[in-house]
Protein backbone atom coordinates (compact mmCIF):
# COMPACT_ATOMS: atom_id res chain seq x y z
CA UNK A 1 0.00 0.00 0.00
CA UNK A 2 1.27 3.44 -0.89
CA UNK A 3 2.06 6.05 1.74
CA UNK A 4 -0.62 8.37 0.34
CA UNK A 5 -3.20 5.56 0.60
CA UNK A 6 -2.33 5.15 4.29
CA UNK A 7 -2.81 8.89 4.81
CA UNK A 8 -6.14 8.82 2.95
CA UNK A 9 -7.34 5.94 5.16
CA UNK A 10 -6.27 7.80 8.28
CA UNK A 11 -8.15 10.94 7.19
CA UNK A 12 -11.30 8.94 6.37
CA UNK A 13 -11.17 6.70 9.47
CA UNK A 14 -10.88 9.65 11.84
CA UNK A 15 -13.16 12.00 9.86
CA UNK A 16 -10.41 14.62 9.74
CA UNK A 17 -11.40 16.30 6.47
CA UNK A 18 -14.37 16.32 4.14
CA UNK A 19 -13.81 15.51 0.47
CA UNK A 20 -12.60 18.63 -1.29
CA UNK A 21 -12.13 20.60 1.93
CA UNK A 22 -9.45 23.28 1.76
CA UNK A 23 -6.50 22.94 4.10
CA UNK A 24 -4.01 25.59 5.19
CA UNK A 25 -0.55 24.01 5.33
CA UNK A 26 2.02 25.62 7.64
CA UNK A 27 4.90 25.50 5.19
CA UNK A 28 8.32 26.10 6.71
CA UNK A 29 10.22 24.83 3.71
CA UNK A 30 11.52 21.80 5.58
CA UNK A 31 11.04 18.23 4.40
CA UNK A 32 8.10 17.47 6.73
CA UNK A 33 5.93 20.43 5.76
CA UNK A 34 6.75 20.05 2.06
CA UNK A 35 5.80 16.35 2.20
CA UNK A 36 2.55 17.23 3.96
CA UNK A 37 1.68 19.81 1.31
CA UNK A 38 2.44 17.38 -1.52
CA UNK A 39 0.52 14.46 0.01
CA UNK A 40 -2.60 16.52 0.74
CA UNK A 41 -2.45 17.99 -2.76
CA UNK A 42 -1.96 14.54 -4.31
CA UNK A 43 -4.99 13.29 -2.36
CA UNK A 44 -7.07 15.99 -4.03
CA UNK A 45 -7.44 18.42 -1.16
CA UNK A 46 -7.24 22.05 -2.23
CA UNK A 47 -4.30 23.42 -0.26
CA UNK A 48 -3.08 26.88 0.60
CA UNK A 49 0.30 27.50 2.19
CA UNK A 50 1.22 29.79 5.07
CA UNK A 51 4.86 30.72 5.60
CA UNK A 52 6.15 32.69 8.60
CA UNK A 53 9.41 34.61 8.37
CA UNK A 54 10.54 35.40 11.91
CA UNK A 55 13.82 37.08 10.88
CA UNK A 56 15.83 35.01 13.34
CA UNK A 57 18.05 32.92 11.05
CA UNK A 58 19.16 35.51 8.46
CA UNK A 59 20.25 33.92 5.17
CA UNK A 60 18.96 30.45 6.01
CA UNK A 61 15.48 31.84 6.64
CA UNK A 62 15.67 33.90 3.46
CA UNK A 63 16.52 30.73 1.51
CA UNK A 64 13.57 28.92 3.10
CA UNK A 65 11.24 31.77 2.15
CA UNK A 66 12.54 31.81 -1.41
CA UNK A 67 12.19 28.04 -1.72
CA UNK A 68 8.60 28.17 -0.41
CA UNK A 69 7.69 30.94 -2.85
CA UNK A 70 9.18 29.04 -5.81
CA UNK A 71 7.54 25.76 -4.78
CA UNK A 72 4.10 27.30 -4.39
CA UNK A 73 4.42 29.12 -7.69
CA UNK A 74 5.47 25.91 -9.48
CA UNK A 75 2.60 23.94 -7.90
CA UNK A 76 0.08 26.78 -8.33
CA UNK A 77 -0.62 26.76 -4.59
CA UNK A 78 -1.82 30.03 -3.03
CA UNK A 79 0.83 31.30 -0.62
CA UNK A 80 0.30 33.55 2.38
CA UNK A 81 3.44 34.98 3.94
CA UNK A 82 3.94 36.95 7.13
CA UNK A 83 7.08 38.76 8.22
CA UNK A 84 7.45 39.23 11.95
CA UNK A 85 9.81 41.34 14.04
CA UNK A 86 10.06 38.52 16.56
CA UNK A 87 12.90 40.01 18.60
CA UNK A 88 10.98 43.23 19.19
CA UNK A 89 7.82 41.36 20.17
CA UNK A 90 9.75 39.11 22.57
CA UNK A 91 11.36 42.15 24.18
CA UNK A 92 8.09 44.08 24.59
CA UNK A 93 6.19 41.05 25.91
CA UNK A 94 9.15 39.91 28.03
CA UNK A 95 8.99 36.36 26.68
CA UNK A 96 11.46 34.07 24.96
CA UNK A 97 11.98 34.24 21.20
CA UNK A 98 10.36 30.81 20.90
CA UNK A 99 7.26 31.91 22.81
CA UNK A 100 6.97 35.13 20.81
CA UNK A 101 7.33 33.24 17.52
CA UNK A 102 4.72 30.69 18.56
CA UNK A 103 2.22 33.37 19.62
CA UNK A 104 2.78 35.35 16.42
CA UNK A 105 2.37 32.23 14.28
CA UNK A 106 -0.77 30.97 16.02
CA UNK A 107 -2.43 34.39 16.01
CA UNK A 108 -1.72 34.81 12.31
CA UNK A 109 -2.94 31.28 11.51
CA UNK A 110 -6.24 31.95 13.32
CA UNK A 111 -6.65 35.17 11.33
CA UNK A 112 -5.95 33.37 8.03
CA UNK A 113 -8.39 30.58 8.87
CA UNK A 114 -11.16 33.14 9.46
CA UNK A 115 -10.34 35.21 6.38
CA UNK A 116 -10.03 32.20 4.06
CA UNK A 117 -12.93 30.24 5.61
CA UNK A 118 -10.70 27.22 6.26
CA UNK A 119 -11.19 24.92 9.26
CA UNK A 120 -7.73 23.42 9.69
CA UNK A 121 -4.04 24.17 9.71
CA UNK A 122 -1.91 21.15 8.88
Task: List each model region and its residues.
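Core alpha/beta nucleotide-donor-binding catalytic domains of modification enzymes
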Residues: 1-122
Amino acid sequence: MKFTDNIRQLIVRHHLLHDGERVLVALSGGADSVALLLVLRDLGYPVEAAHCHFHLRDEEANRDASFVEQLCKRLDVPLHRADFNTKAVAKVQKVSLEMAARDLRYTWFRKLLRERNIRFVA
